[in-house]
Swiss-Prot record:
InterPro entries: Trm112-like. One of its GO terms (cellular component) is cytosol. This is UPF0434 protein mma_2578. Gene3D superfamilies: 2.20.25.10. Belongs to the UPF0434 family. Pfam families: Trm112p.
Length: 60
């Protein structure tokens, strides 16, 4: 992911900064606790595509 692009992108919900998780290929919004996927080098910034970081896998 291009560092210049990361400087420009913000969370589409809160407009806050994002952190790049290289291993998971996601952009993380710590304020909203959401992870936006990066597919083929393209960040998918749709709120309905974000993964909720508050949900523990295997729980409802």
């Amino acid at each position: 992911m291009d560092a210049r692009l990361l400087d420009i992108l913000v969370c589409p919900i809160c407009k806050g900064p994002l952190e790049h998780d290289k291993k998971a290929q996601e952009l993380i919004c710590k304020a909203d606790k959401l992870a936006y996927p990066i597919r083929d080098g393209i960040p998918i910034m749709w709120a309905d595509q974000a993964r909720d970081l508050q949900v523990t896998p295997g729980t409802n």
